[in-house]
């Protein structure tokens, strides 16, 4: 299939990578797995056994007329532990490499189908100036955009750093969440070829 390039003639690309059907279920699974993998999972609270003290029972079992109490660190008591205390846990979800690649292919194909993928021969700024990048993007009618190149250009990265709706990634650093989070994805021809190599 052919992919239109903004500032040059159309290029021939793999139907498998850029022309497949959109698998919403698979993309959802990939997004959830990616976001779950980013969770820290280190939250921890103290149960009755973790709280310091409370080893000796406050009063004897029988004969006082009061309710039975075995420890002053009971969750019912002030200064006691938490009833269902949070524990550190691993939130990662397993997703096969084949499924992950298929999800990325599905996203790229959908970007092409919905005219959200803007392909350019090359994209760079001469100096790390946000103003220069902003004027360049405005000239192309792009405001909310992910810029993907085969390798991150330092000037481009620094220029985009202060723009809230602009992100710069290389092909390896692109993930399901970043690819669907922006209105448009601006991608260079070399990045298209690299995606074909990785996902083909």
Swiss-Prot record:
GO terms for cellular component: ribonucleoprotein complex; ribosome. Residues 38-68 are annotated as: Disordered. The keyword S-adenosyl-L-methionine does not apply. GO terms for molecular function: rRNA binding; structural constituent of ribosome. Keywords: Ribonucleoprotein, Ribosomal protein, RNA-binding, rRNA-binding. InterPro entries: Ribosomal_uL4 (IPR002136), Ribosomal_uL4-like (IPR013005), Ribosomal_uL4_dom_sf (IPR023574). Residues 54-65 have a biased composition (Basic residues). SUPFAM superfamilies: Ribosomal protein L4 (SSF52166). GO terms for biological process: translation. Belongs to the universal ribosomal protein uL4 family. One of the primary rRNA binding proteins, this protein initially binds near the 5'-end of the 23S rRNA. It is important during the early stages of 50S assembly. It makes multiple contacts with different domains of the 23S rRNA in the assembled 50S subunit and ribosome. Forms part of the polypeptide exit tunnel. HAMAP family: Ribosomal_uL4_B. Part of the 50S ribosomal subunit. This is Large ribosomal subunit protein uL4. It comes from Pseudomonas savastanoi pv. phaseolicola (strain 1448A / Race 6).
